[in-house]
Amino acid sequence: MGHSGENVLCVALLAIYLAAGGAAKPVMPERRGYAPPFTAAPSTLGTVDVTACGGITLPTKVDFRGSGGVQVIVRWFFGAPIDDNTTDLCWVPLHSYQADGCHFPADDDFNISTCCAHGTLFVSPDSDYSSYLTGNGDLRVYPGTMDAGIYAFYVRIGDDHFVGAWDLRVKHSKYCHGDYGMKVQVQSLPESSEERVVATDSDSGSCEDDEKEEKSDCEFPEIAVPQTWSKVCTATWGEHGSRLFVWPACLGTHQESIEGAHTAMPVLYYGSKPIASEQK
């Protein structure tokens, strides 16, 4: 009975396993046949924890393999709670990269810089040195203490549209200065500035006036609206580890941003950013 008994036991265990639903399926981005706008944040792919001023990569989990000659659009947004008394979010556009003539390796990682004919990078005036896009569309973010929230993305590959988000929780660190971070910068922007007006055009779905902020109903931006992205940049590619990242030249040189970050972040953290020598 030796082996036959073991086989019966294995079959029985397999039946129980399948009846219970089998292995947990990985959470993947939602695929849509149309372009947003959204009326609410997309479903989150999970919750991630990071220490303030520490780096973390938020992936899109989109499979780029199998097609070619199409346009690729990758956009990321940051949604921060408006106040402690509501679950409403105020959305800030971060990065938008549009690449044309893209071909996707069947068995290799997709990289915008090498797999596409040409591309254009759009950034919001609210963007700063605390985040950047990697070559495959993931978001590398170095959040400040106040930068907990939802980080949502939109990816378009030809006629296919993918949406998803990550819930980022930020742990306090005594080494991370309070005046560093994305939310701090957004809150300090002058409401009367021309760039701020462009970024919060009435069609963009952002917080464009005091009345809307009082109602605490900032909506997810209509990502197809060009006014959401007020700057067009030439993109500089650099390498950090095994990944390429894109740096918007209109925000100044990467070295200048590192030097600016150094005034807000501890020396302990300084070396973890891509260095200027990697910018060629």
Curated annotation (Swiss-Prot):
Species: Psittacid herpesvirus 1 (isolate Amazon parrot/-/97-0001/1997) (PsHV-1)
Protein name, entry field: Glycoprotein G
Note: The PsHV-1 glycoprotein G does not seem to possess a transmembrane like the other family members.
Keyword Signal: yes
Glycoprotein listed as a keyword: yes
Highest taxon above the source species: Viruses
Keywords from the named record: Glycoprotein, Signal
Glycosylation sites per record: N85, N111
Family: Belongs to the alphaherpesvirinae glycoprotein G family.
Region forming the signal peptide: 1-24
Annotated gene: gG
Region: Disordered, residue numbers: 191-218
Residues that span the membrane, as ranges: none
